[in-house]
Amino acid sequence: MSEWTKEQRYQKYEDVDQQTIEKLTEQVNQSEYRQTFHIQPQIGLLNDPNGLIYFKGNYYVSHQWFPLGPVHGLKYWYTYQSKDLVDFKAIGPTIKPDTKDDSHGVYSGSAFEYHDHLYYMYTANHRDSDWNRISTQHIAKMSKDGSINKFPKAVISAPPSGYTQHFRDPKVHVQDGVYYAMIAAQNIKKQGRILQYRSTDIVNWEFQGEVQTNLDDFGYMWECPDYFNLNGYDMLLFCPQGIDSEGERFKNIYQSGYIMGQYDINNLTMNHADFHELDYGFDFYAPQTFLDENGQRILIGWMGLPDINYPSDADGWAHCLTIPRVLTIESGNLKQRPIKALEKLRTNEETALGYANKFTRQLHPYEGKQFELIIDILENEATEVYFEVRTSKTESTLITYNKREQKLTLDRSESGQLPEPVEGTTRSTYLDTPLSKLQLFVDTSSVEIFCNDGERVMTARIFTDENATGIKTSTESGQTYLKFTKYDLKGDTI
C-alpha cells in the first residue's frame, strides 16, 4: 500500500465527491473479512470507542473514525444508537473537525449526563505551521433533535505546567454532585500520567493534580484512562505505551490494563495492587466502560492496535470494536463476561458429549465462520488439550491448554494472513484455576475467548480463508471428557 501524504490524511470527508465515497464503499463491501456482529467502519479506519452511555432509553456508542482509508488521519466521531447493545442503528459522523481547535482531528473522549442532557467531553487536536501539536479539551451538547452543539471555546485550554502536549482522552464521572475528568498525560520527563480536574458547572474546570500511583516509571505515555468503583473496589484503567515485555506479559506493542484498590479522590492517592492486563490476546486497546440500564458496568474495547498493518487494509477498511463485556469483582478478582443480550443472535443449537484423545477429531457437523462455541471440560487427564477453529487443510486457529502449568495459549501462526509487525504468533496466560470452561465468539475475522466464566479473555483478529470452517479437538497424551455446545450467530452486518 502506497504511503499516504499529509494532505491526503487531513482531507475532510465533506470535501470528497460522492463518486469517490461510493467507490470506497463498494471496495469495502467486497472484502471477505467483513464482520457480522461487531461494530466496524463502513469505510476507512475505526479506532478508540468514545462517548459510551445509556441515556433516556438508548445506548450511544461512538468511535474514532478516519473515513477515507485504513490509516490514521483526520479523525471524526462516528456514532451508533441501540436499545440492547446487539442491534445498532448508525447515526453517522456526529462530532466533526470543523473549528480551528480541532482542525487536525476530534480525538477521544467520554459521555456524561448533566441537567437532563447528554454531553460529550473530548480532545481537540490542532497543528500549528511548524506541525507542533496543540491539545485542548472541549465539551459538546446533544440537543433533543440529536444535533451536536460545541461549546464556543475550550474548557481546558492547555496542559498544566510540567506536562507535554500529549494531553488527551478525558473520561468524566460524577461523585456527590461534582464532575471529575481524568485526562491522559505525559510529563516533561516523558513518563505517562493521569491528571484529575473537577467542576461543578461543567464549564469551569479546576486542575487538582496528578493521580498518585506506585507506577512511577511505567511507560512514556498513558492513554485512555477510566475510573469507577466496582463492588467496593476502585478501578483505574489506562493504556501504557513503552512497556517492555516480561515473559508472557506485555507482548503487544501497547498495553491495556488496570490497577485495583482504594482511591482517595480528594488527595489523589491510589493504594493499589499490581497492574493487570485486561485482555491476553493480540488485538485489544483503548477500552472504555459505562453503566447499562440495570447498573451493570459494561466494557467495550477497540479490537486492534496502533502502528500495525492489518490484511483488511488492502480492502479500504480497518478494525472493529469488541463485543460488550460485563465487569464484576468476585473474591477480589475481576471477571469479564459477554453481555447476556448476545444470546438473541443464537440459532441452530448443536451439542456433543465425548472424549478427546491424541487422535485429532473433526467435530461433525460442527463448522462455521460466525458462531458461539461453549466447551465444558468435565474431566481432564490429558497433559495438553487442543482446540482448533476455522480449520481447513492448510489453516487453523489453535487454542492449547497445558494442565500442569494451567497455561492457555492462543496460536494464530496458521490462521491465514497475519497483521504486522507483531511480536510472535502466540499469546499465553496462566489461569488461577484449572480450565473448566471456554466460551468462544467467532466472527468472520475475529475470535474472542472467555476462559473459566470470565477469569481471562483473549481477543484476536484472524484473517482466514473463507473455506476454513472446521472445528477440531485432540490431546497430547491422555484423554479429556468434553461437552460442546455450538450456536450459529446471525448478526446483521453493522
UniProtKB/Swiss-Prot annotation:
Gene Ontology BP, a term: sucrose metabolic process
Catalytic activity annotation: Hydrolysis of terminal non-reducing beta-D-fructofuranoside residues in beta-D-fructofuranosides
Active site location: D48
GO molecular function per UniProt: beta-fructofuranosidase activity
Keywords: Carbohydrate metabolism, Glycosidase, Hydrolase
GO CC term, one of those recorded: cytoplasm
SUPFAM superfamilies named among the record's database cross-references: Arabinanase/levansucrase/invertase (SSF75005), Concanavalin A-like lectins/glucanases (SSF49899)
Gene3D superfamilies in the record: Exo-inulinase, domain 1 (2.60.120.560), Glycosyl hydrolase domain, family 43 (2.115.10.20)
Pathway(s) the chain acts in: Glycan biosynthesis; sucrose metabolism
NCBIfam families with a match to the protein in the record: scrB_fam (TIGR01322)
Protein name: Sucrose-6-phosphate hydrolase
Provenance organism: Staphylococcus xylosus
Lineage, broadest ranks: Bacteria, Bacillati, Bacillota, Bacilli, Bacillales
